[in-house]
């Protein structure tokens, strides 16, 4: 690559660096995007670079595949309803062990390896996430019935003070999605939905979902059907047509929730694409799907 071409690539990022300087970006780092060591390095480098050019990344991570593996090793079969993990007491212990005890620390170490300053948290830290037990309903024989997900929660309140302090001190907060109810009980939170709630509470400019798909497509096997930009109404139409199903539904709910709470745009990118976060933010075309209100 010629020097001029290298300079052109850098200059393309300048308007975006100026536009987003001192803004908060919530990065939801999905468990399926963590399975590749090279991909983990790309994401870590991207986040450290964001911090050094004056953008404030805040990370919420999942860990579904590792939780599933840990459960299977212990003889438990993972169970999901509408993309949400059914969580009994033993499952919750496994979830906390994997998320807080392993994945969170791994992400912090990776960020620090590439020159960043990072701090690992969970929703339990400093009463960060107050949650309540989630009530889930299903349609059966044209009737709405309540199903018990166990110790699964939904966010009631996010206390941003601790995150604000860390961001001001130039740290990258890395948050495990475990909440606490008013009786002090731990609750398992869907990482996508928690990320949307935290993004809204933090007045984040963007929510970026780093996962293992390129974005939202009409046909997951046909890259040419990738949507670069969608509105909420277009998303809802795709759900009605059955083009968005299963585990993607909580992601979309999180996206819409974040937009409803003031986040300006949500982006879904593939963590296995080299430096997907930088390419989505700092180039005109991006590499994933951007979702906006209208």
From Swiss-Prot:
Pfam family, one: AA_kinase
Pathway it works in: Amino-acid biosynthesis; L-arginine biosynthesis; N(2)-acetyl-L-ornithine from L-glutamate: step 2/4
An MF annotation (GO) of this entry: acetylglutamate kinase activity
Site annotation Transition state stabilizer: residues: 28, 251
GO terms classed as biological process: arginine biosynthetic process via ornithine; L-arginine biosynthetic process
Catalytic activity, as annotated: N-acetyl-L-glutamate + ATP = N-acetyl-L-glutamyl 5-phosphate + ADP
Entries under SUPFAM superfamilies matching the protein: Carbamate kinase-like (SSF53633)
Localization per Swiss-Prot or TrEMBL: Cytoplasm
Keywords, sorted A to Z: Amino-acid biosynthesis, Arginine biosynthesis, ATP-binding, Cytoplasm, Kinase, Nucleotide-binding, Transferase
EC number: 2.7.2.8
Similarity comment: Belongs to the acetylglutamate kinase family. ArgB subfamily.
Function: Catalyzes the ATP-dependent phosphorylation of N-acetyl-L-glutamate.
Name of the protein this chain belongs to: Acetylglutamate kinase
Source organism of this protein record: Methanococcus maripaludis (strain C5 / ATCC BAA-1333)
Record gene name: argB
